[in-house]
Amino acid sequence: MKLIVAITGATGAPLAVRLLEALKHIPNVETHLVMSRWAKTTIEHETEYSARDVAVLADVCHNASDQAATISSGSFKTDGMIIIPCSMKTLAGIRTGYAEGLIGRAADVVMKENRKLVLVPREMPLSTVHLENMLALAQKGVAMVPPMPAWYNHPKSVTDIENHIVTRVLDQFDLDSPFAKRWQGIHAK
């Protein structure tokens, strides 16, 4: 399986790091990473990682301005793309087909090739414009996986919450997360 992972500058960089760490533990998954300019800043602000540290978690790292990268073409076969976190600017660009930079172009390619596109939108509160953009994309088959915590699994830390969100993202590709804590029913503890 080949997956594109894109990181935008929206808050939530630890989720992207955790996703890449999870994908490292899943056999036969090749990751292609793209980080926006602001993603690099956000990574260094929100985590203990540098952008370089995050880049080495991926199999291939592409420059966000390289419109000639392999992932900018539909003839380069991938199984889909995850944008985590996804800024509202990026989401709006995807909705309108404005393929600025490699993240927008790769998302456009994934959509036109009818491959799986998963967005982890990061904003609060949501405006009607945000909601309309998300609805329009969802109606086109794009999966919206907002990073919402679950309380049924009794998280003890922020890492537990991140693990749950990453598990739900990986579920979109039918990949088993090494961090999964699955619902076992109300009486199971």
Regions found by a protein language model. Give the residues of each.
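A cross-family phosphate/adenosyl-ligand binding-site feature
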Residues: 1-118, 124-189
